[in-house]
UniProtKB/Swiss-Prot annotation:
Protein name: Large ribosomal subunit protein uL24
Family of the protein in this entry: Belongs to the universal ribosomal protein uL24 family.
Matches recorded under Gene3D superfamilies: 2.30.30.30
Function according to Swiss-Prot or TrEMBL: One of two assembly initiator proteins, it binds directly to the 5'-end of the 23S rRNA, where it nucleates assembly of the 50S subunit.
Keyword Ribonucleoprotein annotated: yes
Length: 104
């Protein structure tokens, strides 16, 4: 079970976007995350009339390492760590500070 999943609200704790919040769009296999609207990079694309792609400079989200982000706890309005707890035979994610379920 992963500590950070898709659609979790996170806060960046290190790097050029430190302090910014966003939602996880994609979790990659090599412990990296794509977050909406953060870590934007410019990519030069060639026009491709076959697929209708217009050329130019395109801004897109680049992956961030999972160690540079923390899950955002809406109850405390701070970054928090995630732990696990077994409840009714199911393993659930909980915030370390409040011991409340992340997915609640």
């Amino acid at each position: 079970m992963q500590k950070i999943r898709r659609d979790d609200e996170i806060i960046v704790i290190a790097g050029k976007d430190k302090g910014k919040r966003g939602k996880v769009l994609k979790v990659l296999a090599n412990n990296r995350l794509v977050i909406g609207g953060l870590n934007l990079v410019k990519r030069h694309t060639k026009p491709n009339p076959m697929s209708g792609v217009q050329g130019g400079i395109v801004e897109k989200e680049a992956p961030l390492d999972a160690s540079n982000v923390a899950i955002f706890n809406g109850e405390t309005n701070k970054a928090d760590r995630v732990g696990f707890k077994v409840e009714d035979g199911k393993k659930i994610r909980v915030f370390k500070s409040t011991q409340k379920a992340v997915d609640a």
